Amino acid sequence: MSGWARALLLAAVLVVMACLVPAATASLHAEETLTSQFAEFKQKHGRVYESAAEEAFRLSVFRENLFLARLHAAANPHATFGVTPFSDLTREEFRSRYHNGAAHFAAAQERARVPVKVEVVGAPAAVDWRARGAVTAVKDQGQCGSCWAFSAIGNVECQWFLAGHPLTNLSEQMLVSCDKTDSGCSGGLMNNAFEWIVQENNGAVYTEDSYPYASGEGISPPCTTSGHTVGATITGHVELPQDEAQIAAWLAVNGPVAVAVDASSWMTYTGGVMTSCVSEQLDHGVLLVGYNDSAAVPYWIIKNSWTTQWGEEGYIRIAKGSNQCLVKEEASSAVVGGPGPTPEPTTTTTTSAPGPSPSYFVQMSCTDAACIVGCENVTLPTGQCLLTTSGVSAIVTCGAETLTEEVFLTSTHCSGPSVRSSVPLNKCNRLLRGSVEFFCGSSSSGRLADVDRQRRHQPYHSRHRRL
């Protein structure tokens, strides 16, 4: 080989080495960063593995999940993804422990739905029930597929508070251990839970203090029926329309809503608004606590049950209006029991035309299924601005066949955005426990001459929010 050829070969080798050294250095740096992140993860979440082989496997899973986080970040420019408490779990492990309700929710999709009627007149631009003190702290379902119980109980906690009672932490363990309609740590349905509470537990929901959660390791202890304190009662539940605008309008007036979602893309979520959520099958139960339509990207606010170390202090935001994560498919809420607070006297002016004989409406609630036994009536005027116990206002009017309630979402003087709903008159409506019937009439003496079944006057309980 000539001298110039040897020189050229040497130069080529040097060039190749010059290229390889930075690449090797970068690779080494990336590996060191990964090792450092993994060590920080283990310390933060108390991970101790049984063997060196197990630790090596978990490190490889950790690496794969960081790559998955980058993929989700690329698809969701308004959200962030990274290391979470689940970063050393395979996707199958994560699914089986934290969002394993696919079979239950698939079965629910086959049943006939009877949603409440919600008319969207003009919901407020933003609602956050956390700011109104209606939501308990984020909880931890642990390695148990009990999301359905946390969703249902979270809803009851909020509804109980908004009916005028103290905010009370209630027991998920009661459902996980005792509700045999559902499957404990293997999944369940919020609607089943509501029905079990009413039909099998006399509507009673125990306090968390008297029946604490004990299934965090994936094992459900046997049901116990004594020694527990009743913290709330429910009388039934309602299903909401599969429409995000109507769900928002209902939530704005009535409070947080239990919903099912597809949570398969949530494992690496750390913050922001998800705009490209996997939306293939329902597999997880959560709680809608608010929304914001005035944001650059309108979003839902969702309370999860994966501790405050996940997401935004235990919450996630997803884009609103495009059925992200299938959020509109299974929405429901408990109907709470108890008397609720007595409404404050209203001094607002009537919105109806003046006249000597004001109109009234009667809500007759009975303990049987035929509106005959144990009936008690509530009588209030129609056409007047009534102050509600949730701090807003409403006007009730009577039509030929229906009673219509218009709730004003941001005003105590019956002005601004409102939501309107209707119920049939003179028809007994069967509930899960008991029944209810509405009547309308008028009398100058202040009693309804055309309703002869009135027993006594009590505060009216609105279908939207108790007045």
From Swiss-Prot:
TM spans (from-to): none
Catalyzed reaction equations: Broad endopeptidase specificity similar to that of cathepsin L
Swiss-Prot/TrEMBL keywords: Autocatalytic cleavage, Disulfide bond, Glycoprotein, Hydrolase, Protease, Signal, Thiol protease, Zymogen
EC class name: hydrolase
GO molecular function, one term: cysteine-type endopeptidase activity
Residue stretches in coiled coil: none
InterPro entries: DUF3586, Papain-like_cys_pep_sf, Pept_asp_AS, Pept_cys_AS, Pept_his_AS, Peptidase_C1A, Peptidase_C1A_C, Peptidase_C1A_papain-like
Enzyme Commission code: 3.4.22.51
Disulphide-bonded residues: C144-C185, C178-C223, C277-C325
Low complexity composition-biased segments: 345-354
Residues in the signal sequence: 1-18
Effect seen on changing V286L: In strain: RA
Biological process terms in GO annotation: proteolysis
Residue positions the entry lists as glycosylated: N169, N292, N377
Alphabetized SUPFAM superfamilies for the sequence: Cysteine proteinases (SSF54001)
Gene3D superfamilies (UniProt xref): 1.10.287.2250, Cysteine proteinases
UniProt-reported outcome of changing T308A: In clone 1800-2
Superkingdom per UniProt: Eukaryota
Record bears the keyword Hydrolase: yes
Family: Belongs to the peptidase C1 family.
Function: Hydrolyzes chromogenic peptides at the carboxyl Arg or Lys; requires at least one more amino acid, preferably Arg, Phe, Val or Leu, between the terminal Arg or Lys and the amino-blocking group. The cysteine protease may play an important role in the development and differentiation of the parasites at several stages of their life cycle.
More details: Purified cruzipain is able to degrade itself, yielding a complex mixture of small peptides, and a major 25 kDa fragment.
PANTHER family: CYSTEINE PROTEASE FAMILY C1-RELATED (PTHR12411)
Protein name: Cruzipain
Organism: Trypanosoma cruzi
High-level lineage: Eukaryota, Discoba, Euglenozoa, Kinetoplastea, Metakinetoplastina
